[in-house]
From Swiss-Prot:
Catalytic activity: succinyl-CoA + L-arginine = N(2)-succinyl-L-arginine + CoA + H(+)
Function description: Catalyzes the transfer of succinyl-CoA to arginine to produce N(2)-succinylarginine.
One biological process term in Gene Ontology: arginine catabolic process to glutamate
Signal peptide (residue range): none
Pathway noted in the entry: Amino-acid degradation; L-arginine degradation via AST pathway; L-glutamate and succinate from L-arginine: step 1/5
Coiled coil (UniProt feature): none
Gene3D superfamilies: 2.40.40.20, 3.40.630.30
Gene: astA
GO molecular function: arginine N-succinyltransferase activity
Residues that, per the record, bind succinyl-CoA: 125
EC number(s) reported in the record: 2.3.1.109
Name listed for the protein in its UniProt record: Arginine N-succinyltransferase
InterPro entries cross-referenced by the UniProt entry: Acyl_CoA_acyltransferase, Arg_succinylTrfase_AstA/AruG, Arginine_N-succinylTrfase
Similarity field: Belongs to the arginine N-succinyltransferase family.
Length: 344
């Protein structure tokens, strides 16, 4: 059974292996052992309530409970921007007009923004290419909503997710090349690495503080504003079906979109409910895929099961109960994995 669980110190080798497969552009998963070890330590301290809210962040891994192999990672930052400033560009409009000359120009413009300060953030979603099957990506992404639903008081009203922008296999970012590089005087990969390893002071020091007309950027850069990396398109679609929307905020490095949603409007959070579990053999049937998660804060587990989403009682085998860290008589959180398609 493949389960989502809290990260542990022993996962460092697995995280390094995953980081080596990202191809760059995933700022929060750098192939740097010291940085990843510090990230694990911060997550463990978050679970033990040893950090202020401004520093808290949860990290989860997707594990095969039989072999112990780790094939994916996902994370939640509790409140961004309360220590280091949280930057986006807001894509807006400036109008230049003259009645005398009969000229009216509405120009797309980038405004430096800290509007998402204090929001909870979904981040560091990466699944090993060999594991991209059997619904693993859905489970990895949406398991965080089960945790947030169970421990709602730990998180803020708005949830954001920065989507990876357009970067080629050589680490070339059209948006960075046309804009960021002119102010930071370094390649995208270098800026990405510095940010991922916590060296963020240079952002505040070198960021352009004034609005930027997008027409001044290359056509290639303009074309990727708000667009995602091809490998990230499925992750974007997953979040949009959960209620997330692009509200014209983009990443300052690669121009990728930032999606956002009020936490209580996220489908999986809103629709999930608690059901009792029993031990036995699950009844056969053609049931839809569902997410199930325990309510154990320190030993959280989530997994994919086939079940009736409307049931009031789930039956699991002894092996499933063990993998989910549950016992008969406990209550688990249940929700349909994907929203039902509306029919006309």
């Amino acid at each position: 059974m493949r389960v989502i669980r809290p990260v542990e110190h022993a996962d460092i080798a697995a995280l390094m292996r995953l980081a080596g497969k990202t191809g760059g552009g995933l700022t929060s998963l750098p192939a740097n052992e010291a940085t990843l070890a510090a990230r694990i330590e911060r997550a463990r301290k978050t679970w033990s309530d040893d950090l202020p809210k401004s520093e808290q962040g949860y990290v989860f891994v997707l594990e095969d409970s039989e072999t112990g192999e780790v094939g994916g990672i996902c994370a939640i930052e509790v409140a961004v921007g309360l220590n280091d400033p949280w930057y986006n560009y807001r894509v807006g409009t400036l109008v230049h007009a003259s009645k005398e000359l009969n000229v009216y120009n509405a120009l797309p413009t980038l405004f430096l923004s800290n509007d998402h300060t204090g929001s909870s953030e979904l981040c560091t979603l990466f699944l090993d290419p060999e594991w991209r099957k059997e619904g693993n990506g859905y489970v990895l992404s949406k398991s965080r909503f089960m945790f947030m639903a169970a421990f709602r008081d730990k998180f803020n009203e708005k949830v954001v997710a920065e989507m990876r922008g357009v970067i080629d296999e050589h680490g070339y970012s059209p948006f960075w090349q046309s804009l960021g590089k002119r102010f930071f005087s370094m390649d995208f990969s270098r800026a990405d690495f510095l940010c991922g390893t916590g060296q963020k002071a240079f952002i505040a020091e070198l960021m352009p503080k004034h609005p930027i007309y997008t027409h001044f950027l290359s056509e290639e850069a303009q074309a990727v504003i708000g667009e995602v990396h091809p490998q990230t398109a499925p992750a974007r679609a997953v979040l949009e079906k959960e209620g997330f929307r692009y509200r014209h905020y983009i990443d300052i490095f690669d121009g990728g979109p930032t999606l956002e949603c009020d936490i209580d409007r996220v489908r999986a959070i809103r629709k999930s409910r608690l059901v009792e579990i029993a031990e036995g053999q699950p009844a056969p049937g053609d049931y839809p895929a569902c997410l199930v998660a325990n309510e154990n804060y320190h030993h959280f587990r989530a997994a994919l099961v086939r079940a009736d989403p409307q049931t009031s009682r789930l039956v699991f085998t002894a092996a499933q109960l063990d993998a989910l860290k549950c016992r008969a008589g406990d209550h688990v959180r249940l929700v349909r994995l994907c929203a039902e398609e509306k029919t006309v």
